[in-house]
Every structure is written in C-alpha cells, then in structure tokens.
Amino acid sequence: MRDIWLIGAGVMAQDYIRVLQGLGRKFVVIGRGEESAKKCREITQCGVVVGGLERYLKSNPNIVSHAIVAVGAESLYHVVLQLLNYGVKNILVEKPGALYKWQF
C-alpha cells in the first residue's frame, strides 16, 4: 500500500495519527488552518501540511491508495468529492459521512 492521506488535524485526526504511527504506516496529514495544525504537531509530534486539500492537490502529488477524512461535518462532502475526482478510491469517512441525503 502506498502512503495514506489523513485529511484533518483536529482531535479525531490526532487519534488516527496515533493508530497509523502504531501500525508503522507512512502517511501525510493535510490540515486547513495553522492553529489546528500547530496543536496537532505539538500533541502528536507529526508534521502537518497546511492550506487544505484543494491547495495540496494543486501540487500534483502522487495518488495514494487510501485516504482518511476526519474533518468537520460541514466539509465532509466537499473533501470526499475532491478525493474521488483526484482518483483516490479507498476512503474512510468519519461519521456522519454526509449531512444531507443528496450527498450520498
């Protein structure tokens, strides 16, 4: 398996970081704001790419085999759509997964 993208840097993402570190997986944390990224770095000792997924994708990174989406509920749909459009096929989406029926 290639690297994993972990989208988000909040509390839930920090839990995923601990799990991925424990499993010895290679992953990239992609956060949006500097404040949450700084807090995440301090707690997990893990680097965070700041600027959000859209900005990160503009740098044309290699497609990963898996992504974990741990962002606020209002951003879930948009983030998952970006990942699918970029070609990421295996996506774990933190609940609720969607806010509206049409987002499924």
Tell what function each PLM region has.
Residues 45-46, 88:
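A structural motif
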Residues 66, 77-104:
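Beta-strand-loop-alpha-helix segment that lines the small-molecule cofactor/substrate pocket
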Residues 5-6, 69, 93:
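Hydrophobic Val/Ile/Leu positions in short beta-strands of Rossmann-like dinucleotide-binding domains
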Residues 46-53:
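Conserved SAM-binding strand-loop segment of SAM-dependent methyltransferases
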Residues 1-45:
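N-terminal Rossmann-like dinucleotide-binding module
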